[in-house]
Regions:
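Sec-dependent N-terminal signal peptides
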Residues: 4-13
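Conserved C-terminal helix/tail region of periplasmic/extracytoplasmic solute-binding proteins
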Residues: 297-323
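Soluble non-cytosolic domains of exported or imported proteins
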Residues: 31, 61-65, 80, 131-139, ...
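Pocket-lining segment of extracytoplasmic ligand-binding domains
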Residues: 83-85, 166-262
Length: 323
């Protein structure tokens, strides 16, 4: 009888190990965040860990709000989203989703057709259309305005922030002359400037941030996340996957034209030409979460100052950062 129990125990352990590495389900965001993933979609159908191959599957989502329910229901293992969204989910729930790497640094700018804008104070009395209410563009803009002693709320506000135009439509509205000032991430600044030589980058948020903070590297914009239980059960698989994504980022940064073509081929929501032109200024990177903790927390503190609910009321604890 004892031998039977031992045999069953070994069998169950073997089945569990097999299940752990049979498939890795990756959730991608359409648009600029996951451009480096196009390389993996083209070249990585599986991933090896401890001599066993796990199939890589990819599912695309319009935004983090569409992706998150599937991660929470354990239908997706790996995902991508803004750092504040990941922190909010971690703080609000049972810490089921953690950050494993920063994959994109800041690439925000104020674009305009007004050549007279040279500094933030030149925006006084203007209406600025901002991409992404409650996201990094809004809170980074708030921070930079505050540091330049500018206000954006109240009856005597120096500027008006408007969030009424979807991000993908801002470039067209600017080119048509319906609006004149906008805060956008890449590749939307590149799209606008490519289609009209009247559109210029007036304010580089990264440059301003570095000058104000004394930091050596700009703020994180997007992160890769993983289900905490998946990461715990599959450390070797995670190690291999993170190494592969790191390589994909390096390849993308060094092969802009080819990366643009792959992005269009795999229907990630952007035309090849746009991606190719935007990659040099998109700040794709790969920084393991443990190494990026300081920069992530610095960014999240800006969210806390602006709206505590934007990250779940507090900075996430050390368990948020995958090691």
């Amino acid at each position: 009888m004892k031998k039977i129990f031992v045999f069953l125990a070994i069998s169950l352990i073997s089945l569990k190990l097999f299940a752990q590495v049979s498939q890795v389900r990756v959730g991608l965001l359409n648009g600029p965040t996951c451009v480096p993933a196009a390389y993996l979609m083209e070249n990585k159908k599986s991933i090896s860990a401890d001599g066993t191959d796990a199939e890589l599957t990819y599912e695309k989502f319009a935004d983090p709000q569409a992706l998150l329910p599937k991660m929470i229901k354990k239908e997706i293992d790996i995902g991508f989203m803004p750092a504040n969204v990941a922190a909010k989910v971690y703080n609000a729930g049972n810490k089921s989703i953690i950050c494993c790497a920063v994959v994109g640094l800041g690439n925000l700018s104020l674009i305009t057709t007004d050549e007279n804008i040279r500094r933030f104070t030149d925006l006084k009395g203007k209406t600025v259309y901002v991409a992404g209410q409650g996201a990094t563009p809004e809170y980074m803009f708030r921070y930079l305005l505050k540091e330049n002693k500018m206000t954006w709320s109240g009856e005597k506000a120096d500027i008006t922030m408007d969030f009424s135009i979807p991000t993908a439509q801002i470039a067209a509205q600017l080119i048509s002359g319906k609006i004149q000032y906008a805060v956008v991430p890449e590749p939307f600044a590149t799209i606008a400037k490519t289609k009209s030589d009247k559109v210029i980058t007036a304010l580089d948020f990264q440059k301003e941030y570095l000058e104000l903070t004394g930091e050596k590297e700009v703020y994180p914009l997007s992160v890769m996340v993983v289900r905490a239980d998946f990461a715990k059960d599959n450390p070797k698989l995670m190690e291999a996957l993170l190494a592969d994504y790191d390589a994909a980022v390096n390849w993308t940064n060094n092969n802009a034209a080819e990366a643009g073509a792959l992005c269009e081929k795999h229907s990630l929501g952007l035309a090849a030409g746009v991606v190719t032109k935007a990659i040099p200024v998109s700040n794709y990177t790969f920084v393991p979460a443990a190494s990026a903790k300081k920069s992530i927390e610095k960014l999240l503190k800006l969210f806390l100052e602006g709206d505590k609910t934007s990250i779940g009321g507090k900075l996430p604890d050390k368990g948020f950062y995958y090691k």
